[in-house]
Amino acid sequence: MSSFTHFNDQGRAKMVDISDKKATVRTAIACSSIVVTKEIYDKISHNEIGKGDVLAVAQIAGIMAAKRTSDIIPMCHPLLLKGVDVSFDWKQSDEQYRLLIEVKVKTEGSTGVEMEALTAASATALTVYDMCKAVDKGMIIGETYLLEKTGGKSGDYARKS
């Protein structure tokens, strides 16, 4: 097992020094979802939620979250992101309406963007919940996970189905 990199010689937390790492193009895709009622699905689809356009606001929240990840994840380095894309797709089955969220993040730097993608996916789902909770508080935020990543010393990763 490799040694922990986020502890100093005194056993206290530290931010890892990445100054010797080569800057490369790095990408990450993270996913999340939220299950809503038919009523919420209809209201989102017809832009009838009182707080505004749910998907537009959630998309912007996801982008903002990716940019601010280092403010809420203690050992995360601040990064200059090259791009963040938040997309949505509906999956419907037997009166269940699941909003699928996919976030793609890209940078050119010395560390990966997995945490930025995961944070953005989470914030996007949370924003949908916040905007729709006046209609129904029983929404369920689903699993949030890394789908794939490219670049860096550890190489590429693709989640197995």
Swiss-Prot record:
A biological process from GO: Mo-molybdopterin cofactor biosynthetic process
Single GO molecular function: cyclic pyranopterin monophosphate synthase activity
Pathway note: Cofactor biosynthesis; molybdopterin biosynthesis
Stretch forming the signal peptide: none
Enzyme nomenclature, EC number: 4.6.1.17
SUPFAM superfamilies: Molybdenum cofactor biosynthesis protein C, MoaC (SSF55040)
Domain of life of the source: Bacteria
PANTHER family tied to this protein: CYCLIC PYRANOPTERIN MONOPHOSPHATE SYNTHASE (PTHR22960:SF29), MOLYBDOPTERIN COFACTOR SYNTHESIS PROTEIN A (PTHR22960)
Name this protein carries in UniProt: Cyclic pyranopterin monophosphate synthase
Species whose genome carries this gene: Bacillus cereus (strain AH187)
Gene field: moaC
